[in-house]
Amino acid sequence: MRLRTRFILIGLALLYVSCFSTGKRREKVEFERVEDEGKVNYVEFKEVFPEEPEIKVGIGRGREIKIKTFGKCEVVDGEGKKLGFSEGGITVSPVEIRKKLIKHWVIIERFLDREKAIVYKMAYPDYQILKLGIYPRYFVAIGPFDKFEEALRFKHPNKKAVFSILEKPSDGKLRIPELKTTLISPIEILCDSFGYKNNKYLGKMLVFADEESGLILVNSLKFEDYIKGVVPWEMSASYPVEALKAQAIAARTHALDVAGIKWHLLKEPYDVTNDFTTQVYRGFTNYRVIDSVVESTRGLVMMSGDRFSIATFFMNCGGSLEGGEEWGDTLIKPKADAFQDLELSVEMLKIKKDTSFACSPRDSAPRIINYGAGSFRWEKKVSLSEIGEILRKEFNVDIGMVKDIKVLKRSASGRVKEVEIIGTKGKYRVKGDWDVRRSLGNLKSSLFVFKKSGNFIIFRGGGWGHGIGMCQVGAAVRALKGWKYEDILRFYYGNVDLVRIYR
């Protein structure tokens, strides 16, 4: 591992040298778009859901929410009162908001199987079993506690985490002037379709009173319609079909894995967000190719035994893929994103463009793919004063004037896992991919080397994103070379099972 990391560091460091020539000129090979609709191998069926599930997506907040409505519509309030209205639009604003109820739990153990959770609990009759998520997971817990601090202070030898869970949303009264009425929160709006902030939505809209933001707007819809609204925002619809299929399966897997489970979602009246904290969703689109790839992979997810794969993805890995161990996925291994079985070495990384890597394609690749390939190698100049300001504003830490930085830990892929920032008033250590990148000026990735130049740090690195899971540019180039989506997925996620969990 140390030797591999050393190779990566040397390779990135040599990006400082002048132009490097490989000597031989390679024959230009044109790419072809692969549109094969052949059947996938090794798919099993496991009826996790008797029918296609629904998902609730948080899409808006504010003191006033305006929704365009299309077709015959109906609104139902929290007490069951129904009002019909014709298309046009409605405006919702809060009249009265009452406090929501959040309870806090100490998590002792987690199970995928309900029967195993029940057996475990038999030895602890005072414990509770919490069922969470669209794809349910069962948590044996102690509680509830009224205050988070109480749960945090509670000591137990098997304590895994503290969950803050929404027991009852804020309620109150909501005004809709177009209907000349006031209704009890939450309200459910049913129409043929909706418009909100220049996007079109299917399913139904839910509006909740909320004591912090005033209102929360939630789009509740069928799961496959949700995936159709995710894929074109996470991967260009111009990408090859097999790459888009891989993206659809990854997006479906990721959503089911985190929906209603990810810690910051437990306090909300929805399953997932519409931004990058889960995955980007912008509602209904008119891309036929997206509809086709989602429908052709309907219900398909990646699983390892009874659990979902860690189906994360990102734009470009810089030629080096991160392992998934720290996220709990041992199938995802650190390796080169190359077409041969190659060890990462100085020969691969000392030039700015190397077509040995899937994420560094030839110039003849489609323009949209070369756009993503542009982050294969990058450079950024950040002032020491800017780093100090980031620490003060975003980390609530003041170490005075920043003088230098020092890398304390790298992963096997070469990514920085821990950095020490040195100032006139002290030192501060930052851990983790996202926080390291954020603290040093929002770097594209943590795969970098640097040098100090006066009052600046010059970073030179590779890739865009965390590096765990599927490299989207690499997936596109593999598809252009004829790879099928199942092969793309197994390269990036390991020996996963492709399982259809509903018809």
Residue ranges and their predicted role:
Residues R2-R503:
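Conserved, single-site charged/polar hotspot
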